Amino acid sequence: LLTQYRMAPQIGSMVSEIFYDGKLKNGEREIKDIYKTSPSALNNVMSWIDTSSLGSKSYHQKEEFGTSIYNTSEANIIIDLLKQISKNEKFISALSDLDKDGDSSIGVICMYAAQRKLLQQKFREIDWSDEFKSMIKINTVDGYQGKENRIIIISMTRSDSSKNITQFMKRPNRINVALSRAMDRLIIVGSGQMWIDKNSELPMGKALDYIKNNQSNGCKVFDIDNEYSLLESGDG
């Protein structure tokens, strides 16, 4: 049997179910209790912020030159999340104490290079504290192999009315990397509609399903329209 010590049990169990036929067991690992004072967006171990209800506003755009895609709505949501987290100074300093040895505490994984570019650009436009800035890392899934962060935010990026998923997003190892980098908290931002029906058997469809079915166990699906305002209110 394989045992993993990196991920919180909920994340480990999901990864085990999707990629290892349930054979990956969770080792004992203490999750630091800094999350007791964390912003409300981090109350759950795993969250999916579902952008479907934004309709066509949730759709991705294609780069003018090049083949990559980006998604402005998702980028804005992620910047809002980071703002909410950054305002909670008590939490930030606790997080920063845990990760003194230099690894970023919060990783943003983009499924497409153009989305990384957009997010880095939006991130640079904001006046963050130096401490917070050094805690954030924004990269593509392919740049993430072998790394881990306490908190991972994934930008799914792809969203349209055809719901066609490209090969790129079907590759289990790629999705496995994205989902298994998170040690304590995993937030997925993207259209849930893309991953039901014909795509529900793909790894990301199974992830959405897992989060939906474990809402009493530290997982939650937020509807961007109705419930996202909950994420905004209250700082922990």
Regions found by a protein language model. Name each.
Residues 25, 107, 125-140:
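Conserved RecA-like helicase motor-core motifs
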Residues 5-8, 113-116, 144-145, 158-161, ...:
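Conserved nucleotide-binding/hydrolysis micro-motifs of P-loop NTPases
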Residues 23-121:
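Conserved helicase/translocase motor-coupling segment
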Residues 98, 127, 161-236:
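Helicase C-terminal subdomain and adjacent C-terminal extension
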Residues 1-32, 111, 194-195:
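Conserved coupling/interface region of RecA-like P-loop/ASCE motor cores
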Residues 5-8, 12, 75-79, 169-179:
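Amphipathic alpha-helical transducer elements in NTP-driven molecular machines
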Residues 139, 143-159, 176-177, 185-189:
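A short beta-strand element within the Helicase C-terminal
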Residues 9-10, 57-59, 117-118, 147-149, ...:
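Switch/connector loops and helix/strand junctions flanking conserved nucleotide-binding motifs
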